[in-house]
Amino acid sequence: MTKYVGIRGHRGSGKISIAYLIANTIEYLMDFKNVGEDFDNLYKSWCNELMKDEQNAVYNIDTPHVYLESFGDLPKMLTEMLTNIPHEYIYSDYYKDHVFINIRTMEYIEMDDNEISNFDHDLWKSQDLIEFVEEYGFGEFDSYWISLREFILYYAKTTSKYLGNDIWVKLMRVSEERDNAMQERYNIFGKGDKYKLFVDLKAVSEVTYVKERNGFIIKINRPRNIKEKGFDNLENDTRYDYELNIEGSLYD
C-alpha cells in the first residue's frame, strides 16, 4: 500500500530538511518498532547521529520505503532537455542563482556575485519576461538573460498558461501510473507499506493530488524565510493536517 505525504512552505522554510528527517524516521520506525521501552532513548541517539551528516541531510532522502517526489522536478527536466545544463546544476540552489541563460540562443554562463553586479545586460525576472514577450515579442533584443532559477519558472509558467495550471499534476499522474505498473510487474518494493513524500507543494492542484490519495499535508512556517509565489496561491488553502513553526536549523 502506498501512503502519501505532502510538504508545503515558502522557499527557505526547511522543506528538504524536514523531508529528510521524516523519511529516515519512517525507516527507523519500521526497523525498530518492536524495541519496547528503550525506543525513546534509541531514537534520540539515532537522531543525534543522523544530524551529524550535513551532506546527507540535503541530498539523501530516498530510502528503502520512502520515495521523494516533487512536481517541480517536471519543469526542471524540461529545462535540462532545452539547455543541456548539467543535471547537478539544476538541483543546486547555488547554481540556480549563479548560472544565467540567454533565452534566444540557450547558451549559459556561470558568474560570481561580483560578475553578476557588473554584467552588461539586463537580468530578467520570469514574470517580467513573460509580460514583455506577450506585448512585444522576442524581436527587440538579441539576448534575454535570465537566471537558471527564473528560467525554470519561466518555462513552468509558460507551459501552465497554454496547457493548463494542472499540467504538471497530469504529467505526475501519468508518470506514477507507469511507475506503479513497473513496480507491480517486477515486485520492486516487495511487500509492505511504502511512502511517497511530495516536497514543495506550490499549487492548489498539487495539494488536491495528495489529498485525493488520502495523504496528509504538513505546512511549514519559518519567520524571515524568503517568500515566493507558486502557480496558484496557497495562502488561502487551509487543507493541511499538521503545521510546524520552525526556528533555527535542522541540527537545533
Residue spans for each PLM region:
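Switch II (G3) loop of P-loop NTPases
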Residues: 197-203
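ATP-dependent small-molecule kinase phosphotransfer cores
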Residues: 36-194
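Small-molecule kinase domains that catalyze NTP-dependent phosphoryl transfer to phosphate-bearing small molecules
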Residues: 6-11, 20, 36, 42-43, ...
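Active-site catalytic pocket residues across diverse enzymes, especially alpha/beta-hydrolases
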Residues: 22, 26, 30, 83
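Conserved lysine of the Walker
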Residues: 15
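Hydrophobic packing residues within well-ordered alpha-helices of enzyme cores
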Residues: 22, 79, 172, 207-210
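Hydrophobic anchor at the start of a short beta-strand
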Residues: 66, 196, 214-218
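Short hydrophobic/aromatic beta-strand immediately N-terminal to the Walker A/P-loop
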Residues: 4-6, 197
